[in-house]
C-alpha cells in the first residue's frame, strides 16, 4: 500500500482484492509482465522478426497511459470511494504535483502491486510459472537419441 497526497488530501493506493477482481486490469497487467504484448501481433510467435518486436514495443508503450489510468483507479478502490472520472482527475493532479510522466507512474504503481501481492493474488505469478515450466518441458534435449546414418 502506498499513501499519496493529491491536492492536499491523503489517499491510499492498494492493489488487493478490488484490483485482482477487475478482469480488464488483470488482463492488461498480464500482457505487460508476461511479454505477450510484445508478440501478440507477430505472424510467428516462436520466431518474431525485428519488425514484430518493434511493433510490439510500440503497442506496449502506447498502452502504458491507459494502464496507469485504470491502475490508479483500481488502486484507489480498496480504500477510497471515488468514481473512475474522479480517479482520472486525481491521477492527473498527482502527476502534475510530482512532475512525473506515465512511465514513472507505471513503475510506481507496479512496485506497489508487487509489495501488495497483487501478482500472486490475481494468479498472474502462478500462471507465468506454469507457462515457464511448460516451456521447459517442451524443450527436451534431443542429444540422447542416436543419430541416424543414411546408407543405401
Please identify what each model-predicted range represents.
Residues 1-10, 51-54, 58, 78-152:
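Charged interaction scaffolds used for protein-protein
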Residues 28-29, 35, 74-78, 115, ...:
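A structural signal for alpha-helix termini and helix-coil/disorder junctions
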Residues 65, 69-73:
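An amphipathic alpha-helix signature
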Residues 1-66, 152:
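Short N-terminal mixed-charge amphipathic segments
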Amino acid at each position: 500500500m502506498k499513501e499519496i497526497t493529491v491536492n492536499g488530501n491523503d489517499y491510499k493506493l492498494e492493489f488487493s482484492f478490488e484490483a485482482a477482481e477487475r478482469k480488464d486490469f488483470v488482463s492488461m497487467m498480464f500482457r505487460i509482465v508476461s511479454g505477450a504484448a510484445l508478440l501478440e501481433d507477430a505472424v510467428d510467435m516462436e520466431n518474431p522478426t525485428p519488425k514484430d518486436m518493434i511493433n510490439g514495443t510500440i503497442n506496449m508503450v502506447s498502452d502504458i497511459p491507459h494502464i496507469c489510468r485504470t491502475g490508479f483507479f483500481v488502486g484507489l478502490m480498496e480504500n477510497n470511494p471515488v468514481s473512475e472520472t474522479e480517479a482520472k482527475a486525481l491521477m492527473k493532479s498527482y502527476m502534475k504535483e510530482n512532475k512525473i510522466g506515465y512511465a514513472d507512474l507505471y513503475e510506481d504503481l507496479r512496485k506497489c502491486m508487487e509489495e501488495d501481492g497483487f501478482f500472486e493474488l490475481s494468479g498472474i505469478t502462478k500462471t507465468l510459472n506454469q507457462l515457464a515450466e511448460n516451456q521447459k518441458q517442451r524443450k527436451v534435449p534431443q542429444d540422447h537419441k542416436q543419430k541416424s546414418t543414411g546408407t543405401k
